[in-house]
A protein has these predicted regions:
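Hydrophobic beta-strand core residues of beta-sandwich domains
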Residues: 173, 190-193
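Loop/turn positions that initiate beta-strands
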Residues: 193-200
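Short, Lys/Arg- and Gly-enriched loop/turn segments at beta-strand edges
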Residues: 204-217
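Short alpha-helix capping/helix-loop boundary micro-motifs
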Residues: 178-191
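Zymogen propeptides
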Residues: 1-178
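Residue-level recognition of well-ordered beta-strand positions that form the cores
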Residues: 5, 202-204
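Generic recognition of flexible, low-complexity loop/linker segments
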Residues: 34-35, 188-189, 210
Length: 219
């Protein structure tokens, strides 16, 4: 067993999660990850592989530097979260996402960058790749960031740049942008969204059914 003894109260020491090539699907070795992220402000001295990797990236909910990369649909996959005060949270996390649109009202997003199933609304980000990979059935809406990437804590504002498209699928994800993709009853919300409107997405992360705030990194 290898381990480090580290004074986490030292202001110069931090815990960070980094993604290989800063996207979900790249396969990069642990030594190469810090090597590609080292700079005068970030010198890495220890690292560990944080999760198993599948076709959609890490299996579990993943956040890095305050950005939500992916969420796990259920509660059966354990993870460790790090908050802004360097406190660790462990357990089986579950994340909810609230969508608020001036034209479509309020709705729930099932997950981020996950495989879309029946009667689900999924939010895809450009961290997944260039397209959603969805089949034809359903409705998809393209958007760009108003105030940065999808936050793991707090509200993210987005603006619709591609009006609702029905029964085509595999929509291109705008650079540094998003696609809302839904099937079944969730399409009732998406078809009401309009080109140029600004909407909000707000996550809430639960560890073992307890809402946890200020999570910046998790896997």
């Amino acid at each position: 067993v290898f381990y480090t003894t580290t004074d986490m109260t030292d202001p110069n020491v931090n815990l960070k999660l980094i993604m290989g090539k800063d996207n979900l699907t790249s396969n990069v070795t642990v030594p190469n990850m810090p090597a590609s992220h080292n700079d005068p402000e970030n010198i890495y001295f220890a690292g560990v592989n944080a999760d198993f990797i599948g076709g959609m990236g890490p299996v579990g909910t993943t956040a890095a530097n305050g950005e939500m990369y992916k969420s796990y649909k259920g509660t059966g996959w354990y993870a460790i979260g790090i908050d802004k005060d360097k406190k660790l949270h462990s357990g089986a996390p579950y994340t909810t996402f609230k969508l608020v649109s001036p034209n479509a009202g309020q709705a729930s997003i099932k997950a981020v960058n996950a495989v879309r199933s029946d009667n689900e609304m999924i939010l895809y980000t450009s961290r997944k790749g260039s397209t959603t990979g969805t089949k034809g059935a359903g409705v998809e809406v393209g958007a760009v960031a108003v105030d940065g990437p999808l936050k793991s804590e707090g509200t993210t504002r987005m603006r619709v740049t591609v009006a609702p498209v029905k029964d085509v699928g595999n929509m291109a994800i705008p650079e540094n942008g998003f696609v809302l993709s839904g099937t079944g009853f969730t399409t009732n919300t998406l078809t009401k969204m309009q080109l140029g409107e600004e909407f909000e997405v707000t996550p809430t992360i639960y560890f073992d059914n307890v809402a946890t705030t200020d999570i910046t990194d998790m896997c």
